């Protein structure tokens, strides 16, 4: 079964982008490479259950088990020892990537309070888009009664685009809600 967002990409986005940019080769048309979700857990040194809860929440959100990131060296001022867990990360590709992005665009982002759209300055100059979320409750899979603490996460959407403008056009065509540019300056 083809994911809904992937079928939109194949049937609507590719012809639209090809018409606008007049690509000479089909491999030049922008596409998604991967989505990386990262969640830092600095307080894991004081509370051992924090790692367990973070892995559970990220597994529910992403649909696959995250990888535990460990400290490479000890830093005494942070009470950090070598090989102590400092974060969890999951990389989504293929259908899981399209399913997650579809849920992010259509379910999670509209549930943010006072959401005005995603910041247009969050592109990195190489055709990738980064966004940070302050809490995991915006995803409908997370049960409010089962969380121990509000935890944020970083999401990196990696594309084959070569510049920020091309990536903006591509993600807008996929349905990402970006902030509108107002004509008056404050």
Curated annotation (Swiss-Prot):
It comes from the Eukaryota. Its main location: plastid. Keywords: Chloroplast, Plastid, Ribonucleoprotein, Ribosomal protein, RNA-binding, rRNA-binding. InterPro entries: Ribosomal_uL5, Ribosomal_uL5_bac-type, Ribosomal_uL5_C, Ribosomal_uL5_dom_sf, Ribosomal_uL5_N. SUPFAM superfamilies: RL5-like. GO terms for biological process: translation. It is found in: Plastid, Chloroplast. GO terms for cellular component: chloroplast; ribonucleoprotein complex; ribosome. It holds the Pfam family Ribosomal_L5_C. GO terms for molecular function: rRNA binding; structural constituent of ribosome. Binds 5S rRNA, forms part of the central protuberance of the 50S subunit. Part of the 50S ribosomal subunit; contacts the 5S rRNA. Belongs to the universal ribosomal protein uL5 family. This is Large ribosomal subunit protein uL5c. The lineage of its organism: Eukaryota, Viridiplantae, Streptophyta, Coleochaetophyceae, Coleochaetales.
């Amino acid at each position: 079964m083809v994911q809904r967002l992937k079928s939109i990409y194949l049937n609507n986005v590719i012809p639209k982008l090809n018409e606008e940019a007049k690509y000479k080769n089909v491999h030049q048309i922008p596409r998604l490479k991967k989505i990386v979700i990262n969640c830092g857990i600095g307080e894991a040194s004081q509370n051992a259950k924090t790692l367990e809860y973070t892995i559970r929440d990220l597994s529910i959100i992403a649909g696959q088990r995250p990888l535990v990131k460990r400290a490479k060296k000890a830093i005494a001022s942070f009470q950090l020892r070598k090989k102590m867990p400092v974060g969890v990360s999951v990389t989504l590709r293929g259908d899981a990537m399209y399913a997650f992005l579809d849920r992010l665009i259509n379910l999670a982002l509209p549930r943010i309070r006072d959401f005005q759209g995603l910041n247009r300055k969050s592109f990195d100059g190489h055709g990738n888009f980064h966004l940070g979320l302050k809490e995991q409750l915006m995803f409908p899979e997370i049960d409010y009664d089962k969380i121990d603490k509000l935890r944020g996460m970083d999401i990196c959407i990696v594309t084959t685009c070569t510049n920020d403008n091309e990536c903006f056009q591509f993600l807008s065509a996929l349905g990402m809600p970006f902030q509108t540019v107002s004509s008056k300056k404050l």
